[in-house]
Amino acid sequence: MDSVSAKHILVDAEHEAQDLLKKISEGSAFEDLAQKFSKCPSGQQGGDLGEFGKGRMVPAFEEAAFGLDVDQVSSPVQTQFGYHLIKRYK
């Protein structure tokens, strides 16, 4: 697999990411939560980062994104930017 398409939600603290993950598991839409809570400008587009290949994202983020199945949401992933929830959509 050379590339994936993913969305993400970026927050400051792991407990925030865990709270959002719980909301997703209870049926909240990932995209709605990204618009409301993500610190990343992509939040306004539902967290959509589009398609990206290997070497384009920081290693921890890339490893998590490439390890997901389509429509799967990651557990919180820590990078130098904060904590991410990642949803692969393609």
Predicted segments — roles?
Residues 26-27, 70:
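Charged, alpha-helical scaffolding/interaction elements associated with membrane systems
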Residues 30, 43-44, 75:
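Generic macromolecular interface patches on structured domains
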Residues 1-10, 36-37, 60-90:
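Proteostasis/folding factors centered on peptidyl-prolyl cis-trans isomerases
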Residues 1-26, 41-57, 86-90:
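Well-structured core secondary-structure elements of compact alpha/beta domains
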Residues 15-22, 31-35, 63:
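Solvent-exposed, polar/charged alpha-helical surfaces in well-ordered, non-transmembrane soluble domains
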